[in-house]
């Protein structure tokens, strides 16, 4: 992937793969789930039922602009921190949860997928990963 991660994150890479795999297994319609940094560079991913023409890494990179703007808007309006972002398109839904202010979980869900379950599973994963990413 080309990105050098802090030693604590590198040592946990297998744990991240397992976590993402478990999330994807529990959510009907999960196309992909990815951990990426605020710079848009993917750290780890699990791809399941993703259309071959869809590039989940590109989606994550593009999401960084939305995430930065949403975080800035939340701070500027004093509404608190951004907790979750949802984007629904004709072909796919995307759920995003911050792990920290610098790292995020993004899930792509195919039409008919279980968005409620996805929200629940991403929240659980976010809580379990917070300490691992707090460097």
Task: Kindly label every feature range from the protein language model.
Residues 2-32, 38-135:
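Acidic, low-complexity cytosolic segments
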């Amino acid at each position: 992937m080309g990105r050098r991660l802090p030693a604590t994150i590198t040592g946990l890479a297998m744990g991240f793969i397992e976590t993402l795999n478990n999330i994807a297994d529990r959510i009907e319609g999960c196309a992909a789930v990815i951990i990426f940094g605020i710079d848009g560079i993917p750290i780890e991913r699990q791809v399941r039922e993703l259309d071959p023409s869809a590039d989940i890494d590109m989606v994550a990179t593009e999401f960084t602009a939305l995430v930065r703007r949403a975080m800035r808007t939340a701070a500027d309006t004093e509404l608190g921190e951004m907790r979750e972002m949802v984007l629904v398109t004709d072909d796919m839904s995307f759920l995003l949860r911050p792990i920290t202010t610098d790292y995020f979980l993004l899930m792509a869900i195919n039409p008919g997928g279980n968005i409620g379950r996805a929200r629940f599973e991403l929240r659980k994963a976010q809580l379990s990963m917070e300490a691992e990413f707090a460097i």
